[in-house]
Amino acid sequence: MKKSLIATVTLLALCALAAGSFAETKKGEKIDGAKEFKEHCAVCHPDGGNVVNPKKTLKKADREANGIKSTKDIIKNMRNPGPGMTKFDKKTISDKDAKAIAEYVLKTF
């Protein structure tokens, strides 16, 4: 039990560290959703999985089973996540970057 708790806390800390660094983009510059995903999300969601809660992966079937079907749903979950997920506010990930990440998730997983 203690090992599980320590592992979860460690993973959450890694996610928080990953969230601390974000890319600046110039006006009109296309945002690379894959790059942003790798920078902010891949630590906890490698290959679309979920190291904290394996039942909540980014795979289409799991997303839809959890009511996440659109770009808007993904961004909403990034901004106001459930237990175990780091909150990505607008200061951490801009709306444009969040949209690029969400589009990448829908297209890739």
Predicted regions, residues:
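N-terminal export/targeting leaders of redox proteins
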Residues: 1-28, 109
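Short, surface-exposed, polar/charged, turn-prone segments marking secondary-structure boundaries
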Residues: 22, 70-72, 85-86
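Short N-terminal segments immediately surrounding and downstream of signal-peptide cleavage
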Residues: 25-42
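Short coil/turn and helix-start
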Residues: 27, 68, 94-95
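Gly/Gly-Pro-rich "capping" loops immediately C-terminal to redox-active cysteine motifs
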Residues: 30, 34, 46-76
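The canonical Cys-X-X-Cys-His
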Residues: 38-47, 101, 105
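Axial heme c-ligation environment in periplasmic c-type cytochrome domains
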Residues: 52-62, 76-109
